[in-house]
Amino acid sequence: MLARVLLGAIALALCVPVPAQAQSIRDQQWHLDALGVPKAHEHSRGKGVVVAVVDSGVDDTAPDLAGGAVVPGAGFGTAAGTTGTRDTDGHGTAMAALIAGRGVSGGALGVAPEATILPVSVGADGEKFTTTAVAEGITWAVDHGADVVNLSLTSEATLTPDLLRAVNHAFDHDVVVVAGTGNDGVEHIGAPANIRGVLAVAGTERDLVPWSDSNTGPETVLAAPAKGIVSAVPKSVVDTGYAEMDGTSAATALVSGAAALVRAAYPDMNAASVVNRLITTATDADVPGRDDVTGFGQVDPFAAITADVADVARNPLAPAPRTTAAPVPSSATPVRERALNGPAWSGGARAGVVLGGLLAILVGVTVTGLLLSRVRRPVSPPLPPRAEIPPPPEEFWNRTRW
């Protein structure tokens, strides 16, 4: 893989786009059958669910995302003033198509092909992504109707309070947050995947084999296919409009799609219960039970929709209320505890942001973003007060490799 390193401290783990082969794109999307997506579509296709893709922007002219799949969003950082509907890099478009691709004429089909994509660009024309831009993008998405926030990115920078606040803002507004563990094959998971309550997604290959380049750690929650994933990209990136990629970015998008299916199947269900369904119905992908490599296992959208799973009042991955400084296990088999450097973190105060499939850059137009209207689901009880951490110097998000 080609490595790209820019000045800064946040990484985007990406892979080189490869033109798809002559056979139909759908036939190359092995991950859909591996996850049982066709069966899941008999019960839910994601209709009415808004998934925010905080990334490089989303090309709303891509055939598999045209016709209303993508609504105008917003841009932050160097993409400020845009609607997020242009993507000169392809990463955001690829993630959006994995989530909600319409599969036009045998093209890229998403896990939730009737969901709506809300694009949030956090950088333009290859400029550096800042933690501030990512945090602002998350907050904006939550305030503009997102049911699920997809963060196919990770950081190796020092944790910033604004990023932590943004993710907690999502939790407080009943939004499911999904993030990748990273693609360096190391035993370290950066932010935002290491924030307690986030669905931290590692990668698998065919036959439930763990993907060797996934970052691992006690924060890992779920896994999904991450090797040889075919999705749509802008034709300005690959002239066929499709590419094959590796990375936990793709795995993250697939889990976001699964979350959208559950939210559509149970429109009154709170985010905590959606998370609970996804983790309790996952298929063991490594050793029996939860482990640091694939978490609770590979996501199973069909089981998550159809299994008899009790609703819960609070996110089973979140910190339990406590009256002392000692850690208290959360209420429903959370990711195994490690020493905390901050009350809301399970992996120390290191943060990092990696996009796991294609490099994130954006070109956009200056239009005001559309405010999505929807009826909010009942909000889960608020989490206990969170102690703030000292603000570090502003860190920049690097693109480390394709």
Name each model-derived stretch:
Residues 162, 212, 268-355, 364, ...:
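C-terminal subdomain of the subtilisin-like protease fold in secreted/lumenal serine endopeptidases
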Residues 96-98, 226-294:
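Hydrolase catalytic cores
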Residues 123-195, 238-241, 245-246:
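Substrate-binding/access-modulating region of protease and related hydrolase catalytic domains
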Residues 1-23, 355-372:
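Secretory targeting and sorting signals
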Residues 13-28, 64, 339-350, 370-380:
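C-terminal region of N-terminal signal peptides and the immediate post-cleavage residues
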Residues 134, 180-197, 202-219, 231-246, ...:
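Active-site-adjacent substrate-recognition loops and nearby beta-strands
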Residues 79-157, 282-288:
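Subtilisin-like peptidase catalytic core
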Residues 25-114, 143:
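Active-site core segment of subtilase-fold serine proteases
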